[in-house]
Amino acid sequence: TLTLEPGLYTVEGWVRTQDVATTDSRSGVRLCLDARPSGDWWRCTEVARGTTDWTRLRVAGIPVPERGRYKVWLGAYGAPDGTAWFERVSLTAAGKPPLDVYLLYPNFRGMLFDDRSQTVRAALGVAAGTGRVKLSLVEETSGQARISRAFEVAPSLTAELDAGALPPGRYLLRAELLGPGDAVRARYPDHRVVKLPARARERLNAWYDERNVLHLGGRPAFVLGLYTTSGYSTSRSTYARGADGWGTERMAEAPINMLINYHLGRAPMPALGVYLDELHARGMRYLQTVNFYHRGDAQYREIDYPAARGGEEELNHWVAGTLGAHPGLAGFYVMDEQPAEMVPTVFRQYRALAAAAPGSVTYGVLGDGRESQAPAWRDALDVMGLDPYPIVKPTGQNDLAMVGEWTRLGQDAVKRSRPVWMVLQYFPLTAAGGWPTEAELRSMSWMAIIEGARGLLYWSFGEKGLAWIKDPRQREHKWAELVRITKEIKALEPVLLAPDAAVVSRESSGGRVRTLGKTTPDGARYLFAYNTRTTPVRVTWTLAAPATETFDLATGRPGPPPEGGAITAELGPHEVRRLRIR
């Protein structure tokens, strides 16, 4: 048992096995870092079994969120037989850099448009010590510092530089930790900032603004997306019909504007071009799957594109340049539930994709025990996703609020300065849980929105999801549920894209009820709320401004009446409430 400080840790060791788990192939031995009993989590290596020579077991990037007592243990998984020997077992902490810098704004690929705020903002963190941090905007070509400011060292701070007087061009945001006599003790890798005229956005298929709202073809949008699977064709009608009548024509019954088809990552370019034509004609944009464009991935050798023979960078650059010219491309799906060790690889890929297709976004998704590694991915992705799948038991026994919790994990990782698009459960993960009910799917959707998600993608319209339902009536029924929910969200898109507002000044639930406030140009206020608990809760909201009435958007009836500048509501377990206030 060890006392650990917050940070990222690696547990590793060597194991030799003899006849381990011969009677139960699911058992074995492993190494773990365990937070129990004070915490409710543990992270373990892969399971070793059978007869093997000395083999390294390792799991890296384990986030320890708070100081406390933790256990490193080695031993059985399940009930294995046989013998195992361990040696050189260790737990190591990732070293913290003396200076940490995260570019908060401009938040889309360092593009500083001249019709938007000209204040460059960065989050600075210093590991220890005293001194100052010097922040500068340096001309990239000449190396001349055009603007500089020094800030006193603090554990964390937000530093700002006014770039309003700078001419258009390419600059480097440079952060230096200064010691005695202003000697440079440490320098963080530079961030590129490019000052551009507003009209430059006309060339961008996709970009997001300072409030993390995605713009597609020049129009702001709340992302409503699907994962799907299919074969490829050079016929739009084939894509429209689908293999069994469930193609893009059926998808278009819902207000879907984003699609990931993860079977088409190495499809012929002519077929992808036709697919993009079909999607764009139906108001959908596409994220091309490139999460295996790394030589270390077994699928890489199956890529038929000639550019693949030139290496990863050439492949990514060619695919991005080729597809990026199509208005139907929104970007690239670059990572799916990968460990933090993959960050350098994905970051290199990000640079190649962004250079060849500047008007695109990269999207990566965390989950499957790696969701707490989200902070490690903040610079490697344009848009972060997480995929909480809470429905594993019969209805009423699941912690749906996991969706909101994971959304906050993503928001905290990017310091609310990048979009977070959540992936929601639209499939049966277990036989006991089955398919999400319509009420559960609606609650999960709004929980993510209330916590700040700027997009939702549902997994999956394709295999393991809707496409695997054998009963035609059930398939129609489950699809109709998602169509209704996405239409409800789409109807409120102007509200969801409005700036957040302090509709409530005080609440009585002690944080058990989470809220999101919005104000629209017509003066209406909107309050979206959900109960995080599995038990009912009564909450009183003190309004920030007087009101005369409320309207429940779900029931179409008057909501709780304002009394004394406040409204009171009863929320059932995990219930969502959507109110318009005037």
Describe these PLM feature segments.
Residues T1-G164, A183:
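Extracellular and organelle-lumenal recognition/adhesion modules and their flexible linkers in secreted
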Residues V184-M251:
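N-terminal carbohydrate-binding accessory modules
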Residues A243-D304, V319, M342-V361, N398-A401:
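Aromatic-lined substrate-binding rim segments of carbohydrate-active enzymes
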Residues D297-A298, L409-A439, L466-W468:
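Active-site clefts of carbohydrate-active enzymes
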Residues E314-T345, G369-Q373, D379-V392:
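Active-site groove signature of glycoside hydrolases
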Residues A432-V483:
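Aromatic/acidic polysaccharide-binding cleft in carbohydrate-active enzymes
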Residues S508-P546, H574:
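Carbohydrate-binding surface patches
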Residues P562-R582:
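C-terminal beta-strand-rich structural cap/linker in extracellular carbohydrate-active enzymes
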